[in-house]
C-alpha cells in the first residue's frame, strides 16, 4: 500500500468478519514494531528519531495502550503484540473477576478463541454444545448449529469468571504487558492537537496512599475497551446514541442436574402479568454442577423502564419443574444485572487517536444479545488498523488509515445491525411477537433460517438459500 492509498483499501483484508486480522500479523510485524517505537508518544504520527524515543521510553510508555482486559481489549492486545508492537493492557480489577453474562458462546465466538489459540478443552472447564433448544407457544424444537465451512460446528459454555482471564493470559503470552488493578482515570491530551497521547491511572496495590499511586502511561494510540459505561470515551466527548437499541440482562447460577445439557436453551414466552415482553429467558448448563439461568429484555417495550427484572426472573423460574433445581436454596450467586449496548450505540469509533471496541462502541448484536464474538473481532480489526498505521512515515498517511476504522466496521456489521434494529422494533409489539413464535416455531426450515439470521452464521459466498438471502439483505441494508 502506498502512502496515498485510501484506508478503505484494507477493509478487504480486515473483513470477512471472522478473518479480521490477517493483515495485522501480515503487516510487516517487524516494521510495525519499529515504526511504533519510532513515533513520539506526544505526536501521533511523526516519524521522530527511533534511537531517541527508544532511549527515552520507560515501562509506562508503549506503542499502544488498551484500556480494559475483557474479550475486546484482550483480543486487541493479542493481535497488537503479534504484530510486533509494545502494548500495555490495563485492567482495573484482578483476575479472576466476575462479569454478568449468559456464558454461552456461539460458533462465531468459538472461532475467535481458536484463532487466538485459547485452550478450550473440557479439562480446562469448557462445555461443548450442539445448538439451540427453543421453547415458546407450547412448542419445543432443537436447532443444531449450522454446518459451515468458515465456522466450527459447535458452541461452548464457560463462566466469565474464567473466560476473561483465559483470553487475557493468552494476550500476555503473546507479549502484551498486562497490568491488573490499574484503574484508568482519564485521558492525557496533547495541548496543541487535542489528541489522546496516553492515560492517567491508579495502581490499586494497597501499599501507598492513593494520590501517590497515580501514574501517566503514554502511547501513540489508545484503544477504549472499558465496557458499556466507557468512562474514557465519555472523557473524550463521546456519548451514547439514543437512536440505538439497548438491552438489559440479569442472571444467576443454580446447582442443577441440567448442568451438562448439550443444548443452549432459550424460552421465548416471557410474561409480566398479561404483557408478553420482547426478550427471552435462558438456561445454559455450565458443566461444573451449575446452570447459568437468566433473562434479557429490550428497550422497545413500554415495560422496559418499569419492570423489576430480578422479580421477573423469580416469577419465571417459579414455573419450572422443581427437580431442575432452580430454587432459592440451590442458588449459588446473587442475581446480577448488566446493560447490553447494541447496534453501534456509541460513535464515532475513532477520534483523535482513540479507537473503540466491544461494549465501549456498542457492538452487541441486536438480534440475539451476543457481544463476545463481535468484541473480539473488533479488537482484531482495531489492532490491524493500528499495526498498519504505525508503519507509515507521515502523520497524514497514518491518520488516513485510522480514520478508515469506522468504515471498516460499518462494512463488516453495519447492514446487519440495521436489520437488527428493525427486528428489535418489530418484536417490541406483543402481537407480532406472539404471531412469530406461534407460526414460526413449528416449522424446522423456518427455524434453521432464523438460527442463521439471529446468530449471524452464514457462508460468506454461495451457501444455501438462507445464506444467500441473509447476506443479500445485510448488503442491501444501509450501514448502521
Regions found by a protein language model. Give the residues of each.
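Glycine-rich FAD pyrophosphate-binding loop
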Residues: 78-101
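Conserved N-terminal glycine-rich FAD pyrophosphate-binding loop of Rossmann-like flavoproteins
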Residues: 94-116
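Long, intrinsically disordered low-complexity tandem-repeat segments
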Residues: 14-52
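Predominantly flavin-linked oxidoreductase catalytic cores and closely associated redox partners
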Residues: 170-324
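A conserved beta-strand/loop capping segment in the N-terminal third of enzymes
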Residues: 110, 115-165
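Beta1/beta-strand and adjacent pyrophosphate-binding region of the FAD-binding site
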Residues: 55-72
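FAD/FMN-dependent oxidoreductases across multiple families
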Residues: 125, 301-385, 391
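C-terminal helical "tail/cap" subdomain of flavin- and related membrane-associated enzymes
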Residues: 387-480
Amino acid at each position: 500500500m502506498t502512502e496515498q492509498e485510501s484506508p478503505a483499501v484494507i477493509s478487504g483484508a480486515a473483513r470477512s468478519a471472522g478473518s479480521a486480522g490477517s493483515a495485522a500479523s501480515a503487516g510487516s510485524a517487524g516494521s510495525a514494531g519499529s515504526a511504533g517505537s519510532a513515533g513520539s508518544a506526544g505526536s501521533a504520527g511523526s516519524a521522530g528519531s527511533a534511537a531517541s524515543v527508544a532511549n527515552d521510553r520507560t515501562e509506562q510508555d508503549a506503542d499502544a495502550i488498551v484500556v480494559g482486559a475483557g474479550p475486546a481489549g484482550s483480543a486487541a492486545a493479542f493481535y497488537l503484540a503479534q504484530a510486533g508492537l509494545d502494548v500495555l493492557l490495563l485492567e482495573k480489577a484482578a483476575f479472576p473477576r466476575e462479569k454478568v453474562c449468559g456464558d454461552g458462546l456461539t460458533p462465531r465466538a468459538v472461532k475467535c478463541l481458536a484463532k487466538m489459540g485459547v485452550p478450550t478443552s473440557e479439562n480446562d472447564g469448557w462445555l461443548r454444545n450442539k445448538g439451540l433448544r427453543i421453547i415458546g407457544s407450547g412448542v419445543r424444537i432443537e436447532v443444531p448449529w449450522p454446518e459451515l465451512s468458515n465456522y466450527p460446528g459447535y458452541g461452548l459454555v464457560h463462566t466469565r469468571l474464567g473466560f476473561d482471564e483465559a483470553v487475557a493470559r493468552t494476550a500476555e503470552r503473546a507479549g502484551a504487558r498486562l497490568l491488573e488493578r490499574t484503574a484508568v482515570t482519564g485521558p492525557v491530551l496533547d495541548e496543541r492537537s487535542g489528541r489522546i497521547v496516553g492515560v492517567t491511572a491508579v495502581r490499586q496495590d494497597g501499599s501507598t496512599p492513593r494520590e501517590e499511586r497515580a501514574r501517566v502511561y503514554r502511547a501513540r494510540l489508545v484503544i477504549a475497551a472499558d465496557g458499556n459505561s466507557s468512562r474514557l470515551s465519555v472523557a473524550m466527548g463521546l456519548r451514547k446514541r439514543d437512536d440505538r437499541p439497548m438491552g438489559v440482562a440479569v442472571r444467576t447460577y443454580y446447582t442443577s442436574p441440567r448442568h451438562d445439557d448439550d443444548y443452549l436453551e432459550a424460552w421465548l414466552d416471557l410474561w409480566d402479568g398479561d404483557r408478553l415482553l420482547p426478550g427471552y429467558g435462558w438456561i445454559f448448563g455450565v458443566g461444573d454442577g451449575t446452570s447459568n439461568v437468566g433473562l434479557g429484555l429490550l428497550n422497545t417495550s413500554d415495560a422496559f423502564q418499569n419492570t423489576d427484572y430480578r422479580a421477573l426472573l423469580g416469577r419465571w423460574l417459579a414455573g419450572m419443574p422443581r427437580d431442575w433445581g432452580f430454587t432459592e436454596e440451590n442458588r449459588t450467586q446473587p442475581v446480577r444485572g448488566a446493560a447490553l449496548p447494541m447496534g453501534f450505540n456509541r460513535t464515532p469509533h475513532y477520534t483523535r487517536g482513540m479507537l473503540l471496541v466491544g461494549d465501549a462502541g456498542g457492538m452487541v448484536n441486536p438480534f440475539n444479545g451476543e457481544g463476545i464474538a463481535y468484541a473480539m473481532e473488533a479488537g482484531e480489526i482495531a489492532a490491524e488498523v493500528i499495526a498498519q498505521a504505525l508503519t507509515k512515515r507521515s502523520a497524514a498517511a497514518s491518520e488516513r488509515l485510522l480514520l478508515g476504522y469506522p468504515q471498516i466496521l460499518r462494512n463488516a456489521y453495519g447492514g446487519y445491525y440495521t436489520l437488527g434494529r428493525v427486528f428489535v422494533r418489530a418484536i417490541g409489539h406483543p402481537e407480532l411477537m406472539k404471531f412469530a413464535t406461534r407460526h414460526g416455531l413449528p416449522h424446522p426450515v423456518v427455524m434453521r433460517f432464523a438460527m442463521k439470521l439471529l446468530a449471524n452464521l452464514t457462508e460468506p459466498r454461495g451457501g444455501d438459500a438462507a445464506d444467500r438471502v441473509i447476506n443479500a439483505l445485510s448488503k442491501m441494508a444501509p450501514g448502521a
